[in-house]
């Protein structure tokens, strides 16, 4: 039977909607494609808009009213070991989780507060867990004079909390940002955000919620429908509610981006696509600078070079 899930703005006023038309179509032999609402395509278990909608509301305001509905609750889908303390890092905790109720582990680069405040980078890891290898990737930042905080998120590495797939994790990232910028000796006017893969996705959502000096998402996703079509088992929220996807998709909130941004990606990974271009077009309507750059490497191999490129970008604002 045809999927009955559709966006409210594209619903059919006819009683019974898509489900009723599916039954009628079965009687006359129409193809499944003919049953889809205009502008929608089939994904894995849900319908996906051909063009992601543009939300009029600012993302920060939308987050105040929206609460994700998790139908399945549990830890991150990625198996991982408990976190230790890698070389060059200080293990700290920050108040993440629901309303700051969970103490989550983060790694902070060693630094000494001085009379001159230091620039800082919040770096969000890829995947759905972290480890020493992720910390090694951010070494370039603290070698370049930035204080770096690398947070873990709820449900990762044996910690408390429920994995939500980008939404509640954004709240954790924002809590980590507040923790970092309020440390002694941190320059709030030179406070940056970066991240790789899933962390790049989160860095965009975070930069649409509050202001950073600049952002450098690496290999970021901008369309959550596409992500969860690939990783359907990670969708633990109510897939019948299109708002769940919208609130995880930065492309739907382009004008909300609150700082200059450089999108980075590897030449050997899935290229920038129409969704990235749509995001950039929507961001520019608000007058916020945004650019994209390809660097040599695949999805993981691009990270060291991208970190160096982000340092060059951030140094424009220091």
Language-model regions: role of each:
Residues 164-183:
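Alpha/beta-hydrolase active-site loop
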Residues 220-253, 259:
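Mobile cap/lid helix-loop segments that gate and shape the active-site cleft of serine hydrolases
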Residues 1-18, 29-34:
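N-terminal secretory signal peptides
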Residues 287-318:
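C-terminal catalytic histidine-bearing segment of alpha/beta-hydrolase fold enzymes
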Residues 68-113:
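N-terminal cap/lid segment of alpha/beta-hydrolase-fold proteins
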Residues 270-276, 302:
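Conserved alpha/beta-hydrolase "acid-adjacent" motif
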Residues 115-118, 124-160:
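Short substrate-entry loop that stabilizes the transition state in hydrolases
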Residues 257, 263-265:
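Short beta-strand/loop motif that positions the catalytic acidic residue
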């Amino acid at each position: 039977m045809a999927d009955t899930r559709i966006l409210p703005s594209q619903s059919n006023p006819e009683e019974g909607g898509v489900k009723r038309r599916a039954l009628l179509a079965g009687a006359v032999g129409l193809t499944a494609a003919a049953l889809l609402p205009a502008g929608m395509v089939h994904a894995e278990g849900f319908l996906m808009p051909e063009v992601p909608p543009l939300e009029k509301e600012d993302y920060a305001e939308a987050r105040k009213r929206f609460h994700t509905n998790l139908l399945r609750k549990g830890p991150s889908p990625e198996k991982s070991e408990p976190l230790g303390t890698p070389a060059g890092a200080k293990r700290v905790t920050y108040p993440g989780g629901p309303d700051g109720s969970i103490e989550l582990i983060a790694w902070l680069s060693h630094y000494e507060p001085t009379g001159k405040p230091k620039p800082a980078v919040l770096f969000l890891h890829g995947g759905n867990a972290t480890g020493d290898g992720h910390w090694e990737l951010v070494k370039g930042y603290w070698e370049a004079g930035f204080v770096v905080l690398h947070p873990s998120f709820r449900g990762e590495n044996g910690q408390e909390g429920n994995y939500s797939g980008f939404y509640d994790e954004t709240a954790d990232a924002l809590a980590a940002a507040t923790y970092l910028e309020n440390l002694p000796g941190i320059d709030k006017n030179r406070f940056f955000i970066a991240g790789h893969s899933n962390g790049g996705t989160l860095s965009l959502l975070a930069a649409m919620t509050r202001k950073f000096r600049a952002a450098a998402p690496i290999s970021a996703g901008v369309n959550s429908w596409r992500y969860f079509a690939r990783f359907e088992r990670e969708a633990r929220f109510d897939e019948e509610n299109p708002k769940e996807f919208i609130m995880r998709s930065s492309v739907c909130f382009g004008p909300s981006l609150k700082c200059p941004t450089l999108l980075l990606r590897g030449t050997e990974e899935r290229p920038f696509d129409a969704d990235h271009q749509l995001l950039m077009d929507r961001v520019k309507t608000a007058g916020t600078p945004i650019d994209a750059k390809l660097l040599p490497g695949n999805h993981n191999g691009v990270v060291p070079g991208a970190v160096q490129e982000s340092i060059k970008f951030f140094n424009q604002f220091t």
